[in-house]
Amino acid sequence: MLRFLPDLAFSFLLILALGQAVQFQEYVFLQFLGLDKAPSPQKFQPVPYILKKIFQDREAAATTGVSRDLCYVKELGVRGNVLRFLPDQGFFLYPKKISQASSCLQKLLYFNLSAIKEREQLTLAQLGLDLGPNSYYNLGPELELALFLVQEPHVWGQTTPKPGKMFVLRSVPWPQGAVHFNLLDVAKDWNDNPRKNFGLFLEILVKEDRDSGVNFQPEDTCARLRCSLHASLLVVTLNPDQCHPSRKRRAAIPVPKLSCKNLCHRHQLFINFRDLGWHKWIIAPKGFMANYCHGECPFSLTISLNSSNYAFMQALMHAVDPEIPQAVCIPTKLSPISMLYQDNNDNVILRHYEDMVVDECGCG
């Protein structure tokens, strides 16, 4: 009678319902989160603004009771229930000579996509290049950004990796702030064929503007760019197992508001992540009100209700034959939560989880 709950989610809530929150086996919860083991982040990663905003918007909607499709990222216009912010694991390359006519900055960009599970479908991959804060009062030269796919693994001591065909070329004023590029097709190819992921080759040139009358020093511009440049990859995926169409739950008998404590009703249960030692990798929330259902479902609760209801029929059969189990106290309404956390690759992840909070209970 509990088949409408995902197995792992139900196992998690059942253990909590039995009052064993501190002792329960950690792997059940970690597996439900899509993790093989408890993350041990090497360093604290700041939460990107876009992830923080999406999380806060969802929290506000849940507080006010506004219904939202949490498997659709409105802010980005794509379907998905897992948002990952992957830091660049590449490094700078140093050309032998810097001039206005040559490359100002070269960098190998590398993003580890191994955290994406097999069932997840990529719906967005957005490369972000932060070129430093915007400045309208201290404009610099125009920059030309070129991106190449790296064809072979970089060999230590090699001056530059072997770039393939250029697939992005864009001119931007500097300082510009953040510049974004759509890498969905590239990321899909990397995800399907991990051995092809040798990274990206980024080249930035300083364009000479003879008409501006301003004499820029390329060396100064390049040095400032090396200090300010930060690259990241925002990846959104959709897990079809967790983002299915809304299901009609099997009807359960609502429990009347009676004073008897033994009857089926919702019990409050707050899960504090600090108490469990998970605050080191779960950024937000600090905990959540999971709740659970517990209590008896005697025949007297069902006799006056619709006789076609399955719970009423089971209660009736139990009255005839005690060998048949009674109707049980189950969740009739559950709500999701969103979580911000870090994984073992120092990725910041925003993930939506269905059926984590028990809102109402009934006999079913």
Curated annotation (Swiss-Prot):
Signal sequence bounds? 1-24
The record, for InterPro entries, names: Cystine-knot_cytokine, TGF-b_C, TGF-beta-rel, TGFb_CS
Q: Which UniProt keywords apply?
A: Cleavage on pair of basic residues, Cytokine, Cytoplasm, Developmental protein, Disease variant, Disulfide bond, Glycoprotein, Growth factor, Microphthalmia, Secreted, Signal
| Entry PTM | Synthesized as large precursor molecule that undergo proteolytic cleavage, releasing the pro-domain from the active, receptor binding, C-terminal region of the molecule.
Query: Where would one find coiled-coil regions in this protein?
Result: none
Glycosylation: residue positions? 112, 306
> Pfam families in the record, alphabetically?
TGF_beta
Looking at the UniProt record for this protein, which Gene Ontology cellular component terms does it annotate, in alphabetical order? cytoplasm; extracellular space
Q: Which domain of life is it from?
A: Eukaryota
**Compartments, as annotated in UniProt:** Secreted; Cytoplasm
Q: List the disulfide bonds.
A: 264-329, 293-361, 297-363
Which PROSITE patterns does the UniProt entry name for this protein? TGF_BETA_1, TGF_BETA_2
Propiece span(s): 25-250
One GO-annotated biological process of the protein: somite rostral/caudal axis specification
Instruction: State the Gene Ontology terms under molecular function.
Output: cytokine activity; growth factor activity; protein kinase binding
Q: What does this protein do?
A: Growth factor involved in early embryonic development and adipose-tissue homeostasis. During embryogenesis controls formation of anterior visceral endoderm and mesoderm and the establishment of anterior-posterior identity through a receptor complex comprising the receptor ACVR1B and the coreceptor CRIPTO. Regulates adipose-tissue homeostasis and energy balance under nutrient overload in part by signaling through the receptor complex based on ACVR1C and CRIPTO/Cripto.
Disorder cited: Klippel-Feil syndrome 3, autosomal dominant: A skeletal disorder characterized by congenital fusion of cervical vertebrae. It is due to a failure in the normal segmentation of vertebrae during the early weeks of fetal development. The clinical triad consists of short neck, low posterior hairline, and limited neck movement.
Additional information:
In contrast to other members of this family, cannot be disulfide-linked due to an atypical cysteine knot configuration, where the fourth cysteine is missing. This fourth cysteine is involved in an inter-molecular bridge to stabilize the active form of homodimeric or heterodimeric signaling molecules.
Record family assignment: Belongs to the TGF-beta family.
Q: How does it assemble?
A: Homodimer or heterodimer (Potential). But, in contrast to other members of this family, cannot be disulfide-linked.
Protein name, entry field: Growth/differentiation factor 3
Supply the source organism for this entry: Homo sapiens (Human)
